[in-house]
Amino acid sequence: MRNSMKIMFSADGISKSDLEKTATVSKYVDCVKIGHILCSTLSFKEIHELVGDKDIFLDFKLHDIPNTVKTAIENYSKAIPNFKYFTFHGTASDEMIKAALTADTQAIPLAVITLSSDANFDKADSLAKFQRCVDLGVENFICHPHLVADVRAKFGDKIKLYVPGVRLESDLSDDHFNALTPKKAKELGVDYIIVGRPLLRAENIVEKLKEFEC
C-alpha cells in the first residue's frame, strides 16, 4: 500500500524576505528542493546553514555526456550535506540515464519527462518516454500534473510520482496553470507534492502548510 502523500518545499526565492521564509518553512518539511537560482546565489554551505539538516533535492535536470553526469552526481554527493534526490532529463540517451542510475551515491534519481509549466505536450509520446525510462530501471519521476492519472493507470505502484505545480484553489493564478489541488493529487496517487511560491507568499506558513496536507 502506498504511504500518505508527502510535501517537498521548493526553495528558489532569493530576496531577503524569501530567504528568511525559506529558513522558516524548512523547519516544517522533510525535504527542500534547490535549483539553479538558489545555487548560483548561495554556496552549498550557506544553503545548509539556511535549511538545516533537511534532505536536499537538487533540481538541476542533468543532461550531458554519461561520464560528466555520473561524475557530477558523485561530486555533489560529497559537497552537499544530506543530498537525497536529484533530477535528470528522462529524454536523454540510454547511456546517460544508466549513468545517472549507477552513480556512486545514496541520492535518489528522478527522471523529468515534461516540465509542469508546459501546456503543449503529446500525451502518448510522454507515456512512451515514461515506458522507456521504466524499462531502463527508473523508479522515480517528476510528473506533469495532467499526466498523473494516465501514468498511474499504466504503471500502477511500480513507480513513485513527484508532482510540482500543486496549488490550492485560491492560488491558481501563476505560471503553473496546469496545477492540481492537493486533494486531487492525493486522489490520483501522487507520492510527493512539490510546493514553493504559495508557502513563500503565505503570511502564516504553518497554517498554509496545513492546507496542503491531506
Residue ranges and their predicted role:
Residues F83-S93, R167-L168, N178-K208:
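Glycine-rich phosphate-binding active-site loops on the catalytic face of alpha/beta enzymes
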